[in-house]
Amino acid sequence: GIGIVLDGVFSHTGSDSRYFNREGRYGEGGAYRDANSPYRGWYDFDPKYKGGYRSWWGFETLPEVEEEDPSYGNFVCGKGGVIDTWLGLGASGFRLDVADELPDDFIEKIRAAVKAHGEDKLLIGEVWEDATTKEAFDHRRTYLRGHGLDATMNYPFRNAAVAFARGEDASAVGEQIMSICENYPKPALDCAMNFLSTHDTERGITAIAGEPANGRDRYWQSKRMIPGDRIDDALRRVLLAYAMLYTLPGVPCVYYGDEIGMQGYRDPFNRAYFDWNSTERRLRVPLSNLARLRRSCDAFDGGSMELVEASADVLHYRRVGKEQSAEIILNNGPHLIVRTAFGKQTEVNPGGFTILVEDNQPQHVGYFKYY
């Protein structure tokens, strides 16, 4: 089936919302226009701020809210509130925007409201770093201690996959991967959101094979595309990165358009409309195959993670489940390599990967090769 996880933006509202109403779209009500508005306590009005109120990173169109205001807390977390309403209508969970800017106790209230609809309802947070060592507001955050987020967006894995696919040394990539695997509680690791692109990053193919923007202006970014004679190599590198994200711990996610090789630097170029006229299809079948493999092999469903080799051009790791084990060998170099997996010599093509799966039961010894 399909589950819908909503994006919950609870650290700020729009200035043009009925709650703030700076532009007067909703009459004379709203916190900005009416000092007696029921929403007035949601915001911090003070002449010291630009525009006379505290706003998200100084953007006056995004006034910040006071999450600890009782009225606001009830609006989001109370009976008939935002979370209760949407989960009651069938949503499967929430992704919290800028989770590191939400107080821990507010996240705990959100969790309680989410889990009131069932323990299977998901609460995932936007955290760009290792969520177990993240510090914000002068203290160590407690996201993954069992009373906050179920999991976070896995930017560390994304950064590792991009680096490896670009051809960077595998040793640092292996260290980054294992740091997350060792630091995260297993339930949080198993449902971490693995991705190559988001609405806040360059698209994966651009990050991997495009010319770095290096602060260049939007006009330059709007015109810059990967040359046609490099597209084949770019798509191959993107598939290498996705092979990592589909076989590492966590849940792989494909940002719309990645499956047809859509390019784009950061906002707004990474948020372009889906290109319905695209004839690019070379990633669709391999990505579908990776998805089928992941569903068919229990090693990828909560199996243990062991790094076998991370050196120069080679990243080799093993996943072990109850019924099956898998060995994944990735090669970001220009030469064919040979490695041992399940006791057998295995070739991996330049810029390619090989996934071997073996049944753990003695009576079913054998393996099949994916790539």
Describe every region a protein language model picked out.
Residues S11-H12, S17, N21, G27, ...:
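Active-site-proximal helices and loops of the catalytic beta/alpha 8
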Residues G1-L89, I110-A116:
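Substrate-binding/active-site clefts of carbohydrate-active enzymes
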Residues Y53-D69, G88-A91, G204-A207, N214-D229, ...:
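Short glycine/proline-rich turn/loop motifs
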Residues L287-C297, D301:
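Amphipathic alpha-helical
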Residues I4-L6, F94, L123-G125, N194, ...:
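Hydrophobic faces of well-ordered beta-strands that scaffold small-molecule active sites
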Residues N331-Y371:
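C-terminal beta-sandwich/jelly-roll accessory domains of carbohydrate-active enzymes
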Residues F137-D138, D190-I226, Y242-E280:
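Aromatic/acidic polysaccharide-binding cleft in carbohydrate-active enzymes
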Residues V308-A341:
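Carbohydrate-binding surface patches
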